[in-house]
Design a protein with these regions (language model features):
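Active-site glycine-centered loops adjacent to acidic/histidine catalytic or metal-binding residues
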Residues: 8, 42, 218
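Short active-site oxyanion
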Residues: 35-38, 59-61, 152-154, 211-212, ...
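Short, structured coil segments at secondary-structure junctions
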Residues: 56-59, 67, 173-175, 228-229, ...
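Active-site phosphate-binding/coordination module
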Residues: 21-121
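Asp-based phosphoryl-transfer active-site loop
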Residues: 3-17
Length: 267
């Protein structure tokens, strides 16, 4: 019997336009009404979770955000688990990136901090009504240097293979960081941060066994979450390595694959 359902957001519960359909939200609500603990498990910071989810009262109590950097109990308004990067070390890293043709972003105190007006505009286009948590700064290094908080995540966007290699070289000097490279950007977290580590911590706190956990995802950052779950469902649009680990491959996010999987395999 499934007691907890961990749901990735982008590429899973959201369609190709980064929107959640009525069918998807209705099916998630049906699972919650059946007593299943719904846990949004996202690479987004808390304040950028999908608007359709946040507007549904009583749909979920716990969140895993910033790829596992934070687990929050919204009812008690407290953080249950966190894995953060030291602010001073992030400042050093950002300083080393100075002069490179990159754009830098961070997740700080559950908010998405973007550097420069162009990235803010792009963020608002992508996130739509989910943008309450976006803040723009002109100089990321100066901003991080002034604050008094440790950092959930850093993202660096680059525009050439040469710059990508240079960023990778810089990261070699930060063994306390983990990183995940895409073709145009790298996500950087505290070492051992993952959706799986966070899900294990939450399940342990709630007394829920691995075989009582189901998860649905689409990306490589969902692989650790799969390791923590008894029932692993990959989207039809998922990366090949996730499909190989899945117990079930559902339809793509363009045709409400997550909703169909919940209806067929969990309820």
């Amino acid at each position: 019997m499934i007691r907890l359902l961990a749901l990735d957001m982008d590429g899973t519960c959201l369609n190709g336009r980064s929107r959640m359909t009525e069918e998807t939200i209705r099916t998630i609500r049906k699972a919650a009404d059946a007593g299943i603990i719904i846990v949004p498990t996202s690479g987004r910071p808390l304040t950028c979770l999908p608007y359709r989810m946040t507007q549904e009262k009583g749909l979920y109590r716990y969140t895993i955000t910033s790829n596992g950097a934070q687990v929050v109990d919204l009812e008690e308004k407290k953080t249950l688990f966190r894995m953060l990067m030291k602010r001073e070390r992030v400042v050093q890293f950002l300083r080393e990136c100075e002069g490179l043709n990159v754009v830098r972003m961070t997740h700080i105190q559950h908010r998405y901090v973007m550097e420069g007006p162009l990235m803010e505009v792009a963020g608002r286009i992508v996130y739509g009504r989910d943008v309450d948590g976006i803040r723009r700064v002109n100089d990321m290094e100066a901003f991080v240097e002034k604050i008094h908080y440790d950092i959930e995540e850093v993202q660096v966007y680059f525009f050439s293979g040469r710059t990508r290699r240079k960023v990778a070289e810089i990261l070699e000097g930060y063994p306390e960081f983990s990183s995940a490279f895409g073709s145009k950007y790298v996500e950087i977290f505290a070492k051992n941060t993952s959706k799986g580590t966070a899900l294990n911590a939450l399940a342990s706190r709630l007394g829920i066994a691995k075989e009582e956990i189901a998860c649905i995802g689409d990306s490589a950052n969902d692989l650790p979450m799969f390791e923590a779950a008894g029932l692993k469902i990959a989207m039809g649009n998922a990366v090949p390595e996730l499909k190989k680990k899945a117990d079930i491959v559902t339809y793509s996010n363009h045709i409400n694959g997550a909703a169909k999987a919940i209806e067929q395999y969990i309820l």
